[in-house]
From Swiss-Prot:
Region (Disordered): 115-393, 459-589
Region called Nonhelical region (NC2), residue ranges: 29-117
Induction (free text): Up-regulated during vascular injury, in atherosclerosis and in diabetes.
Main location, first listed in the record: secreted
Location relative to the cell: Secreted, Extracellular space, Extracellular matrix, Basement membrane
Sorted UniProt keywords: Angiogenesis, Basement membrane, Cell adhesion, Collagen, Extracellular matrix, Hydroxylation, Repeat, Secreted, Signal
Organism: Homo sapiens
Gene: COL8A1
Signal peptide segment: 1-27
GO CC entries: collagen type VIII trimer; collagen-containing extracellular matrix; endoplasmic reticulum lumen; extracellular region; extracellular space
Spans annotated as Triple-helical region (COL1): 118-571
Entry GO MF terms: extracellular matrix structural constituent conferring tensile strength
UniProt protein name: Collagen alpha-1(VIII) chain
């Protein structure tokens, strides 16, 4: 009996291993059919099997490449019908030998040799891999414990799939919470007028101000005149009945006017909404023209006209030189000369706007104007009664593709939905795997129209439409708020000369210049003109004198009256044609002292052989404004320059012919005060000052008569920087002139 514990203990170990291996197989994942471990056939005598000693019951499993024992991996379970087919229990596995009466040796028998423990043999080589067994039956294991969630995977990179078929309209959901008031939308186009609804119940009398006059309605059809009924007898006044609920009756026949009742109490001020803005009235007549504006400033002096040709020289004998008479009185104003050529256009006048004219009489009522612009959208009215369910809306824009959900249970086959509109062609996908050919399905019936879906989101803003027809001119709006200062623009081109500005305040006169050195004593001047004395007071009558001696012979008497005309003389001899003006001048006669000047100052030979004199005279204009201060002003545009005594490059006139000269200058003032001086040999002999007023173009002029000797210089100059507003332009000329009155 001492031998029994070994085989029984070995049997229990084998059963435990078999059951544990079955549990392990049901709990893992399935990776395919693995070969069973090689079974070591028991070495049995005729009846008693031979077992290995305790501690080496488990056969050796060869290791795979990954370090795990072959056949010991956890099989992976798949979904569906992919459970591993394990061999049916107690059929394919060789049953262990039963330990019963057969394992116990009978009396008289010999003890099995397996009970005698021998030496451990050498480790054998692994046997060849056996053929795969038949698939086992699906296991029914206990679900394992839920594993921990794995680490978050990398974000998938996929291409957008094809748009899915439009789903069936869902059932009407519960009404959502009231959303916030959205922004005020744009005024939509005027809808088609709906059918006239039934008349509503008679409302309470409103308290409001009368609105504006409405548009005249269309005249209704003229009704038939009914027969005039007879007045019935007046009945007794019955008790006051309950308030009825009836429709307002037709208006009754107008009764006779009643007696004028007492005035009622003044009612409370009405509270009502302002009426609709009326249409703009007809345009009134034009007002009377305003009073004429003030005359603009005087334009610049025009260009002097062209001097006419000289007259034909007279024919006469030179008379004797008479005694120079006393200077006569100034002559009267001569007759008006011929008008000169029209000057260039003056500067535009600056006139102030006239006073508004009196209000004109009210004009006749005009034709009703065109329909005015559409008014602003009124306040939001009370919500109306819910209308009937509308037609199903258009399918909404497909939303973004959501994350893949868990695989659900296969649902029943749905009905065929409404064929949606053809979607836009998607991007070309990658070629997929070859699928199995499917069975052709049956065409489903068209389902009933679904409930009205929820309003879709507001679509994107459409593209700008075509430019519409310009609308009617609207009512001028109110003055808007002051805009933000804009970005300074680029510097523009220089504009045309502006209108002369107004003169500013007069500036201080600069200090006088440093007195120059004392000049050399001049030549003695010419004798003065004979004086004109007034007769004195008559003296007392003296006593008669003694008769005087015989006086000298008296002066010849006055010439007698002209005698009778003499006989006709010989035919006249015409002198040759004189040269053009400016080439020479005739003999200038006596000088200031009554003596003829010598013909030594530039005498020229005329075309007819006689002496000719060119007058020293000039007129020059300034073309550029604001010349430099402290230097002669260069009047650089010449109109006339006799004998070339004026140099336009320096602005200086140099005397060549001694005599008495007359100089004049005319200057314009703009942008500042102007102070000019007429210089003779670097000494100012005359000053002219003009004050500038902003917005006005002012002018100043001066003239002087100077006695010049050969070599004397005359010019204009501005002595101070504080008054240097000497201006000139294309149509605004500043000029400098001078000419010889008579030589010395």
């Amino acid at each position: 009996m001492a031998v029994l514990p070994g085989p029984l203990q070995l049997l229990g170990v084998l059963l435990t291993i078999s059951l544990s291996s079955i549990r392990l197989i049901q709990a893992g994942a399935y990776y395919g059919i693995k070969p069973l471990p090689p079974q070591i056939p028991p070495q049995m005598p005729p009846q008693i099997p031979q077992y290995q000693p305790l501690g080496q019951q488990v056969p050796h499993m060869p290791l795979a490449k990954d370090g795990l024992a072959m056949g010991k991996e956890m099989p992976h379970l798949q979904y569906g019908k992919e459970y591993p087919h394990l061999p049916q229990y107690m059929k394919e596995i060789q049953p262990a030998p039963r330990m019963g009466k057969e394992a116990v040796p009978k009396k008289g028998k010999e003890i099995p040799l397996a009970s005698l423990r021998g030496e451990q043999g050498p480790r054998g080589e692994p046997g060849p891999r056996g053929p795969p067994g038949p698939p086992g039956l699906p296991g029914h294991g206990i679900p394992g414990i839920k594993g921990k969630p794995g680490p978050q995977g990398y974000p998938g990179v996929g291409k957008p799939g094809m748009p899915g078929m439009p789903g069936k309209p869902g059932a009407m959901g519960m009404p959502g919470a009231k959303g916030e008031i959205g922004q005020k939308g744009e005024i939509g186009p005027m809808g088609i007028p709906g059918p006239q609804g039934p008349p509503g119940p008679h409302g309470l009398p409103g308290i409001g101000k009368p609105g504006g006059p409405g548009l005249p309605g269309q005249p209704g059809p003229k009704g038939d005149r009914g027969p005039k009924g007879l007045p019935g007898p007046q009945g007794l006044r019955g008790p006051k009945g309950d308030k009825g609920f009836g429709m307002p009756g037709a208006p009754g026949v107008k009764g006779p006017p009643g007696m004028h009742g007492p005035p009622g109490p003044v009612g409370l001020p009405g509270v009502g909404k302002p009426g609709v803005t009326g249409f703009p009235g007809p345009q009134g007549p034009l007002g009377k023209p305003g009073a004429p504006g003030e005359p603009g400033p005087q334009g610049p002096i025009g260009v002097p006209g062209v001097q006419g040709p000289p007259g034909i020289p007279g024919i006469g004998k030179p008379g004797q030189d008479g005694i120079p008479g006393q200077p006569g009185f100034p002559g009267g104003k001569g007759e008006q000369g011929l008008p000169g050529l029209p000057g260039p256009p003056g500067l535009p006048g600056i006139g102030k706007p006239g006073f508004p004219g009196p209000k004109g009489d009210r004009g006749m009522g005009g034709v009703p104007g065109a329909l005015g612009p559409r008014g602003e959208k009124g306040p939001i009215g009370a919500p109306g009664i819910g209308g009937p369910p509308g037609e199903p809306g258009l399918p909404g824009i497909p939303g973004p593709m959501g994350p893949p959900g868990a695989i659900g249970f296969p649902g029943p086959k749905g009905e065929g939905g409404i064929v949606g509109p053809q979607g836009p062609p998607g991007p070309k996908g990658e070629p997929g795997l070859q699928g199995f050919p499917g069975k052709p399905g049956f065409l489903g019936e068209v389902g009933p129209p679904g409930m009205r879906g929820l309003p879709g989101p507001i679509g994107p803003k459409g593209e700008a439409g075509q430019k519409g027809v310009p609308g009617l001119p609207g009512v001028p709006g109110l003055l808007g708020p002051k805009g933000e200062p804009g970005i300074p623009g680029d510097q523009g081109l220089q504009g045309p000369p502006g209108i002369p500005g107004i003169g500013g305040p007069s500036g201080p006169i600069g200090p006088p210049g440093i007195p120059g050195p004392k000049g050399e004593p001049g030549l003695p001047g010419p004798p003065g003109f004979p004086g004109i004395g007034k007769p004195g007071v008559a003296g007392l009558h003296g006593p008669p004198g003694k008769p005087g001696a015989l006086g000298p012979q008296g002066q010849p008497g006055l010439p007698g009256p002209p005698g009778p005309p003499g006989p006709p003389g010989p035919p006249a001899v015409m002198p040759p044609t004189p040269p053009p003006q400016g080439e020479y001048l005739p003999d200038m006669g006596l000088g200031i002292d009554g003596v003829k000047p010598p013909h030594a100052y530039g005498a020229k030979k005329g075309k007819n052989g006689g002496p000719a004199y060119e007058m020293p005279a000039f007129t020059a204009e300034l073309t550029a404004p604001f010349p430099p201060v402290g230097a002669p002003v260069k009047f650089n545009k010449l109109l006339y320059n006799g004998r070339q005594n004026y140099n336009p490059q320096t602005g200086i006139f140099t005397c060549e012919v001694p005599g008495v000269y007359y100089f004049a200058y005319h200057v314009h003032c703009k942008g500042g005060n102007v102070w000019v001086a007429l210089f003779k040999n670097n000494e100012p002999v005359m000053y002219t000052y003009d004050e500038y007023k902003k917005g006005f173009l002012d002018q100043a002029s001066g003239s002087a008569v100077l006695l010049l000797r050969p070599g004397d210089r005359v010019f204009l100059q501005m002595p101070s920087e504080q008054a240097a507003g000497l201006y000139a332009g294309q149509y605004v000329h500043s000029s400098f002139s001078g000419y010889l009155l008579y030589p010395m």
